Amino acid sequence: MESRLFNTPAKKAFGQHFLVDRYYIDRIIHAINPQPNDHIVEIGPGQGAITLPLLKCCGSLTAIELDRDLIAPLTAAATPIGKLDIIHRDVLTVDLSILAKQGNKKLRLVGNLPYNISSPILFHVLQQAAIIADMHFMLQKEVVDRMAAPPGSKVYGRLSVMLQAWCEVTTMFVVPPDAFQPPPKVNSAITRLVPRDPTTIRIADTKRFSDIVRAAFGQRRKTLRNSLADICTPAHFEHAGIRTNARAEQLEVTEFIALANAKNT
């Protein structure tokens, strides 16, 4: 059954596909399991399909929306329900730590992320994982598959390693194109990300770790000896216990961490 609050048309420039199917809206709310006084931040509330049910549960909610035309109708729809604070900005420019300080608690992020910038958004929030309790995002299923991919998989790559290093990644369920208006050309999926305890991650230098992962998968058909020639010496590989003739997709996340932490002696 279709559920619409207002008829502001979707804009291709913003990668908008509005969720309208009540069955999937209810499933998403159930997966998020919002509680009173949760500090929820929604990225791209759109027409409020998820926003308003969350607001009913929590009483207040912060939304980050770039499309100015959606702000007034969404505010009007939310006013009888609870306190909705809309930040009219590109999420990539928002410092989430400020929002966490305002509420004095970790954030719960949710959102139907625009497919055209989903990866930049994921890397942006990953940098602020320490102030995030959990994340529930809807993305293109292909992206969700990459996020949760195990080593050895064809879609295991930089996104897989970076996200899994800092978060537990779980694929929840698939959402078909006809649940949206306009319908996208591909399936979508809901993913849950729960940041790991920082004391268990043990990455000594996050920039070096990121550089190694980027370089390794930037030339994934090459052996690590060749793809990481400018970053890692044979001593690094020896200390980490990693074969130089291995390829990026063969390494576990923990092995990338070991390689980044290895000493050059």
Curated annotation (Swiss-Prot):
EC number(s) recorded for this UniProt protein: 2.1.1.182
UniProt cross-references to InterPro entries, sorted A to Z: KsgA/Erm, rRNA_Ade_diMease-like_C, rRNA_Ade_Mease_Trfase_CS, rRNA_Ade_methylase_Trfase_N, rRNA_adenine_dimethylase, SAM-dependent_MTases_sf
GO CC terms: cytosol
Enzyme class (EC, first level): transferase
Subcellular location: Cytoplasm
Catalytic activity: adenosine(1518)/adenosine(1519) in 16S rRNA + 4 S-adenosyl-L-methionine = N(6)-dimethyladenosine(1518)/N(6)-dimethyladenosine(1519) in 16S rRNA + 4 S-adenosyl-L-homocysteine + 4 H(+)
UniProt keyword terms in alphabetical order: Cytoplasm, Methyltransferase, RNA-binding, rRNA processing, S-adenosyl-L-methionine, Transferase
Binding site for S-adenosyl-L-methionine: 17, 19, 44, 65, 90, 112
Listed Pfam families: RrnaAD
GO terms, molecular function: 16S rRNA (adenine(1518)-N(6)/adenine(1519)-N(6))-dimethyltransferase activity; RNA binding
Methyltransferase as UniProt keyword: yes
PANTHER family per UniProt: DIMETHYLADENOSINE TRANSFERASE, DIMETHYLADENOSINE TRANSFERASE-RELATED
The family this protein is said to belong to: Belongs to the class I-like SAM-binding methyltransferase superfamily. rRNA adenine N(6)-methyltransferase family. RsmA subfamily.
Role, per record: Specifically dimethylates two adjacent adenosines (A1518 and A1519) in the loop of a conserved hairpin near the 3'-end of 16S rRNA in the 30S particle. May play a critical role in biogenesis of 30S subunits.
Name of the protein in question: Ribosomal RNA small subunit methyltransferase A
Annotated organism of origin: Xylella fastidiosa (strain Temecula1 / ATCC 700964)
